């Protein structure tokens, strides 16, 4: 089949080489955007008097036929035509004849593909933003149910201090809020039209770039044509933002994986988000959480792959940039699906509140409470820290916990200790009293929930 760019060439191409150079297997995802860009471009060509209105009408009608066929799944693409742009132009030629060749006036595939990617990413990021907003709602709803659910807080994966489970959930709410802000802020750098930049230097035709940008719903145009066709920062930024978002999902998934284990039993995932074993009948595995954790590395790989492709590229277009799409498509799908799966897991998981709270009774996470108690009685904190540390060692040697120590022994250690110490050492009191701003105290959690609901 004759190439649309074949005038310069005498030799025939070979199918296996065509296959290697073709991108239609993946860039056909942007067929809708490519058709939209072409419709805006031909409207601009007509408005500016670059092609006759009658020819513009023919081209427009042909493009709309292709849109209808695309919606019905009736368009067939070929690797012979390399990419989505040449495939659509060839299909348009079959629909309306030689006048289709005028569509590419004042346009290059360089600004065409960049336009497609901006359009595609803009819409896809908007969908991710909606899913992220939904996840934040789910977290707040779950947190409202567990303001007074006590759980161990950890450092080094060792019991540290007791927390409200709502406090733990709202920590992730904060992370996902920053993810949301990053994505929303990035849209202004996606929402820019490169159309009209042509190959790299602009065009001699009297085009109106602002008009085509307006038709496509862009807020601005690239001020520099060379930048317009060379820029892939908007994709890198999306991949970077996605990597951070997936990292947050992965951290939470790691905790869910631990919490569903027999050793923790803090939560139970519903059957829909779990799988069994082909040999061990008793198994209920948190596979969806594990997959999100695993797919995080995949998204990181897409980011580093894109950075590596671009690191040595001179301006403007190079064939290397064909490698900018699959990582973007893959990340979009991975992030979207991961968010939806994760929100479903959180929304439906069962929280074993009694087991959570019981686990704070069989540890020394109340040791700080005793140190603070002594400090409030006038004992220098470092001295109080030393006293409590020695008492913890003594308790571990005797197989008891701080709440099991007799009052008489406490008063031998320090006569300032009174019988209110047992209330102080309870995990619920420990959580309740931490009412510094942003702390885990119940009153602070309620304030935090009211504040978060204003941002939903």
From Swiss-Prot:
Name the gene.
Answer: argH
Name the HAMAP family on file.
Arg_succ_lyase
UniProt pathway annotation? Amino-acid biosynthesis; L-arginine biosynthesis; L-arginine from L-ornithine and carbamoyl phosphate: step 3/3
One Pfam family cited in the UniProt record for this chain: ASL_C2
Instruction: Write down the CDD domains for this protein, in alphabetical order.
Output: Argininosuccinate_lyase (cd01359)
* PANTHER family found in the cross-reference section: ARGININOSUCCINATE LYASE
State the name under which the record lists this protein. Argininosuccinate lyase
Does the record bear Cytoplasm in its keywords? yes
């Amino acid at each position: 089949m004759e190439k649309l760019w074949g005038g310069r060439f005498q030799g025939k191409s070979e199918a296996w080489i065509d296959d290697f150079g073709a991108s239609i297997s993946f860039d056909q995802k942007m067929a809708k955007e490519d058709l939209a860009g072409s419709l805006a471009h031909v409207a601009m060509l007509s408005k500016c008097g670059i092609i006759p209105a009658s020819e513009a009408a023919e081209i427009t009608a042909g493009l709309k036929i292709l849109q209808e066929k695309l919606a019905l799944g009736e368009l067939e693409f070929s690797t012979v035509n390399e990419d989505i742009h040449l495939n659509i132009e060839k299909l348009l030629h079959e629909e309306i004849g030689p006048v289709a060749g005028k569509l590419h006036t004042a346009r290059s595939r360089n600004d065409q593909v960049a336009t497609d990617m901006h359009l595609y990413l803009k819409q896809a990021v908007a969908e991710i933003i909606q899913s992220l907003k939904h996840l934040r709602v789910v977290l707040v709803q779950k947190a409202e149910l567990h303001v007074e659910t006590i759980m161990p807080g950890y450092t080094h994966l060792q019991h540290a201090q007791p927390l409200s489970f709502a406090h733990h959930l709202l920590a992730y709410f904060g992370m996902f809020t920053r993810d949301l802000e990053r994505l929303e802020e990035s849209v202004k750098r996606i929402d820019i039209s490169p159309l009209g930049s042509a190959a790299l230097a602009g065009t001699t035709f009297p085009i109106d770039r602002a008009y085509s940008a307006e038709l496509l719903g862009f807020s601005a145009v690239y001020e520099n044509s060379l930048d317009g066709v060379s820029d892939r920062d908007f994709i890198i930024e999306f991949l970077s933002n996605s990597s951070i978002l997936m990292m947050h999902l992965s951290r939470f998934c790691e905790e869910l994986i631990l919490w569903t284990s027999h050793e923790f039993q803090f939560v139970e995932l519903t059957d829909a988000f779990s799988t069994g074993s082909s040999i061990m009948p008793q198994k209920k595995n948190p596979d969806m959480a594990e997959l999100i954790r695993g797919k995080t590395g995949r998204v990181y790989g897409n980011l580093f792959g894109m950075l590596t492709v671009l690191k040595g590229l001179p301006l403007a277009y190079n064939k290397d940039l064909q490698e900018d799409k699959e990582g973007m498509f893959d990340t979009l799908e991975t992030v979207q699906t991961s968010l939806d799966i994760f929100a479903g897991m959180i929304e439906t998981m069962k929280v074993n509140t009694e087991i959570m709270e019981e686990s704070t009774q069989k540890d020394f996470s109340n040791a700080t409470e005793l140190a603070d108690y002594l400090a409030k009685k006038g004992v220098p904190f470092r001295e109080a820290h030393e006293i409590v540390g020695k008492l913890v060692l003594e308790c571990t040697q005797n197989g008891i916990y701080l709440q099991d120590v007799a009052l008489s022994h406490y008063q031998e250690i320090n006569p300032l200790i009174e019988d209110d110490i047992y209330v102080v050492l309870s995990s619920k009191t420990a959580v309740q009293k931490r009412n510094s701003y942003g702390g885990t105290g119940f009153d602070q959690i309620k304030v935090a929930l009211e504040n978060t609901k204003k941002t939903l």
